[in-house]
Amino acid sequence: MRYTVALTGGIGSGKSTVADAFADLGITVIDADIIARQMVEPGQPALNAIAEHFGSELIAADGTLRRRALRERIFSHPEEKAWLNALLHPLIQQETQRQFQQATSPYVLWVVPLLVENRLYQKANRVLVVDVTPETQLIRTMQRDDVTREHVEHILAAQATREARLAVADDVIDNNGAPDAIASDVARLHASYLKLASQFVSQEKP
């Protein structure tokens, strides 16, 4: 198994910006959200199953999934959310495993928004948390997704708390300031992770 750094953070924290900075340094990034989106692209069996289960009104005219409509449907129906998770989780795990096997960089950055909620931090060698204040999360998400404050507050209430994420963190990037500051933080952590990955490999050898 390749040395794995799990990256997490709440909605609007800037996980993608941080992940992109690691990718620019040549690190393989495996993003659970991107994989989940790929699983429901037109032509994928999962999208057909969703249309069959929830109805064709969740499929747009161009054949793509109406994500917001699906989110609204499962938000107020826990049993529907459970059905969707049972459909997608095995597919996501399978694709994640495939990408890990194909990774070539000294360590892998595994981006998992629900790392704490699903207790997946146990599968990583190290946990990196992108930390921002809840108010920053609200403002950024409202601007990015063009949604109401109330909508974002509902999402925040369903996610792990800031304290719960920080409790499992080995490293923290404070992303409350300007995005430019991220590059230096990532460069510093990258140097540290290269050393840790090298030690990990030497310990793994018989």
UniProtKB/Swiss-Prot annotation:
Ranges of residues in domain DPCK: 4-200
PROSITE patterns: DPCK
Main location: cytoplasm
Keywords in alphabetical order: ATP-binding, Coenzyme A biosynthesis, Cytoplasm, Kinase, Nucleotide-binding, Transferase
Enzyme Commission (EC) number: 2.7.1.24
Record pathway: Cofactor biosynthesis; coenzyme A biosynthesis; CoA from (R)-pantothenate: step 5/5
Class in the EC hierarchy, top level: transferase
Binding site for ATP: G12, S13, G14, K15, S16, T17
Single GO cellular component term: cytoplasm
Keyword Nucleotide-binding belongs to the record: yes
Reaction catalyzed: 3'-dephospho-CoA + ATP = ADP + CoA + H(+)
Localisation per UniProt entry: Cytoplasm
Keyword Transferase: yes
Stated role: Catalyzes the phosphorylation of the 3'-hydroxyl group of dephosphocoenzyme A to form coenzyme A.
Protein known as: Dephospho-CoA kinase
Record organism: Salmonella typhimurium (strain LT2 / SGSC1412 / ATCC 700720)
Lineage: Bacteria, Pseudomonadati, Pseudomonadota, Gammaproteobacteria, Enterobacterales
Gene this protein is translated from: coaE
